[in-house]
């Protein structure tokens, strides 16, 4: 085991900045400021890892240092398996993580292979080396709660209390996103270290293990109409049940525990973190049974809050499916967050554009933010987000920024960043990527593609096509994964990263990749018959051969 830290500065140890970018982002994923359990190579999301084991990690390191600028390294579930001569505008790395043949695409088979050292769970950005800490999901979470406020609470969350659970790498964004919308958040986590991490990074305001204290703080903040986030240490099922018994009014209920992984991601009711760890190793089968039973109860409690007037939604961890499989037949009575709040953005090719400063200098991000304001002065949502981000976001590892941009905007910003690097206004190359949760890169029937207009929720072709077109367009590293967010058997998804190093070659690649990538999002939603997507494609001149038939669905 080694302690990995994000590498900063202007000197490089690889044969080019592109290879150096891959290495630095791999290191960044495992920086203690960023990763959940770096000693185990776990970045976030239960067992979402950056490399299969330490031996494979060191082989990846060595290969990247030796990789020529016209070669491509292939990575199979966190292990480097080949290097081939390609060309300078091909990706330097192609990654496939935890992809199983459908009949065997379940946790039992995955865990068998994992024990044999043959596979690795890459989550979404863990195994594709573009995780930037909780900031990576904060804006999406912020936009989700903002839209919820628009739909249900006259445009704002002031005077509301949200109850949720899970303060890991993804869920850790919730307290900050809710307070950014002026709401009160009670965020439950059984693991006190996770609450502490969110307090340390200022994503969460206060910590307590006393439910009565949490409710008192929440009520007082609600009456004042002020935002406040409370990290409450405890088991979600116990806490939810107690709040219902006390009759305390909850306005919004959701959940972001790692319920997608019943063995490694969720702690059953009645167990401490340490007790759960012992049982997990001693009797994994019993652990999963207890975990799934707790999830069923968890969803029943969420449904009861909904019955009492709370706005309920699933935050993409597949907890409804587990509950349904364990006897809760009305588990899907509350919607997922994508169809409820996010899909119109996807129809315009909008999604989680993100970039990181390889120099490690926060001034590079400040300059990039300034440029974004100049490029998109009419985008009020973006400007408001940048104000909030600059005020409230603490960097984890390499300085970075998330900014939801749409078709046309991403290419424009990417080219601007490349120009700033070329002209020395930004001191070192910038890495540009995104979450796999994006407009055209995921097939996930219980999350991103839930309730598609044409019923194409489970069609996986789109995620494959996204990876293929971004490879053809010349991304710096491209990934294809299975099971991220919602667990084995429930999702296929692709990621892309492209490096802005100031060169003409980078300019060509940036323009191509940052057009094809969001373009796939528009195309996917055109094909499903969404009017916003059809209008966007026509306005932007995206060539969709059968667009005139799309509206018939």
Swiss-Prot record:
UniProt xrefs under InterPro entries: Urocanase, Urocanase-like, Urocanase_C, Urocanase_central_sf, Urocanase_CS, Urocanase_N, Urocanase_Rossmann-like, Urocanase_sf
Any Pfam family matching the protein: Urocanase_C
Major site of localization recorded for this protein: cytoplasm
Record's keyword annotation contains 4Fe-4S: no
Co-factor(s): NAD(+)
Any one GO BP annotation for this protein: L-histidine catabolic process to glutamate and formamide
Role description: Catalyzes the conversion of urocanate to 4-imidazolone-5-propionate.
Full protein name: Urocanate hydratase
Organism the protein comes from: Staphylococcus aureus (strain N315)
């Amino acid at each position: 085991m080694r302690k990995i830290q994000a590498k900063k500065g202007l000197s490089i140890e690889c044969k080019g900045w592109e290879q150096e970018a891959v290495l630095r982002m791999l290191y960044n994923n495992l920086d203690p400021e960023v990763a959940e359990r770096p000693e185990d190579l776990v970045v976030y999301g239960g067992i979402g890892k950056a490399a299969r084991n330490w031996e494979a990690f060191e082989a990846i390191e060595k290969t990247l240092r030796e990789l020529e600028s016209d070669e491509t390294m292939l990575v199979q579930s966190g292990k480097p398996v080949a290097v081939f001569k390609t060309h300078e505008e091909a990706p330097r790395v192609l990654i496939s993580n935890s992809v199983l043949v459908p009949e065997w695409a379940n946790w039992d088979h995955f865990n068998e292979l994992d024990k044999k050292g043959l596979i690795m769970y890459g989550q979404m950005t863990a195994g594709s080396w573009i995780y930037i800490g909780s900031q990576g999901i904060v804006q999406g979470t912020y936009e989700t709660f903002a839209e919820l406020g628009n739909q249900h609470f006259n445009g704002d969350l002031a005077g509301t209390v949200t109850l949720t659970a899970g303060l890991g790498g993804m869920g850790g964004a919730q307290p900050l996103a809710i307070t950014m919308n002026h709401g009160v958040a009670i965020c439950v986590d059984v693991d006190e270290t996770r609450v502490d991490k969110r307090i340390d990074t200022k994503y969460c305001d206060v910590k307590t293990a006393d439910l009565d204290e949490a409710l008192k703080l929440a009520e007082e903040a609600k009456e004042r109409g002020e935002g406040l986030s409370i990290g409450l240490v405890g088991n979600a099922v116990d806490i939810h049940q107690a709040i219902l018994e006390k009759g305390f009014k909850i306005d919004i209920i959701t959940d972001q525990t790692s319920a997608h992984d019943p063995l490694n991601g969720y702690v059953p009711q009645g167990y401490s973190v340490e007790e759960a760890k012992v049982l997990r190793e001693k009797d994994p089968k019993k652990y999963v049974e207890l975990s799934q039973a707790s999830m069923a109860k968890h969803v029943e409690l969420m449904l009861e809050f909904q019955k009492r007037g709370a706005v309920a939604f699933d935050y993409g961890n597949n907890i409804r499916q587990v509950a349904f499989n364990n006897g809760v037949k009305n588990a899907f009575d509350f919607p997922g967050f994508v169809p409820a709040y996010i899909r119109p953005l996807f129809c315009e090719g909008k999604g989680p554009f993100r970039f990181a400063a390889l120099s490690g200098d926060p001034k590079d991000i400040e300059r990039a933010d300034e440029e974004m304001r100049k490029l998109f002065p009419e985008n009020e949502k973006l400007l408001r987000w940048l104000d909030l981000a600059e005020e409230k976001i603490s960097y984890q590892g390499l300085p970075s920024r998330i900014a939801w941009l749409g078709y046309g905007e991403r290419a424009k910003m990417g080219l601007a960043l490349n120009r700033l690097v070329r002209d020395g206004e930004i001191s070192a190359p910038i890495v540009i990527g995104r979450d796999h949760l994006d407009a055209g890169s995921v097939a996930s029937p219980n999350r991103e593609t839930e309730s598609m207009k044409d019923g194409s929720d489970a069609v996986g072709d789109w995620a494959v096509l996204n990876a293929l077109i971004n490879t053809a367009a010349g991304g710096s590293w491209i990934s294809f994964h299975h099971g991220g967010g919602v667990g084995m058997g429930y999702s296929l998804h692709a990621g892309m990263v492209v490096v802005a190093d100031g060169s003409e070659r980078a300019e060509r690649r940036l323009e191509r990749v940052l057009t094809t990538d969001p373009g796939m999002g528009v195309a996917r939603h055109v094909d499903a018959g969404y009017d916003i997507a059809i209008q966007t494609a026509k306005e932007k001149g995206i060539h969709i051969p059968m667009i005139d038939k799309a509206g018939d669905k």
